[in-house]
Amino acid sequence: MSKRTFQPNNRRRAKVHGFRLRMRTRAGRAILSARRTKGRAQISA
């Protein structure tokens, strides 16, 4: 039997997909901008 692949971890989630990480790079800021334009309720983890 293999274990489930998704092992929730809030700290890892924030470090990998968080707002501060997105703001760090030009591409990340572009992602946030696109999500704001689209009207996403949540723009990052």
UniProtKB/Swiss-Prot annotation:
NCBIfam families: rpmH_bact. This is Large ribosomal subunit protein bL34. The lineage of its organism: Bacteria, Bacillati, Actinomycetota, Actinomycetes, Kineosporiales. InterPro entries: Ribosomal_bL34 (IPR000271), Ribosomal_bL34_CS (IPR020939). PANTHER family: LARGE RIBOSOMAL SUBUNIT PROTEIN BL34M, MITOCHONDRIAL RIBOSOMAL PROTEIN 34 FAMILY MEMBER. Keywords: Ribonucleoprotein, Ribosomal protein. The keyword Ribonucleoprotein applies. Coiled coil: none annotated. It holds the Pfam family Ribosomal_L34. PROSITE patterns: RIBOSOMAL_L34. One of its GO terms (molecular function) is structural constituent of ribosome. One of its GO terms (biological process) is translation. GO terms for cellular component: ribonucleoprotein complex; ribosome. Belongs to the bacterial ribosomal protein bL34 family. The gene is rpmH. It comes from the Bacteria.
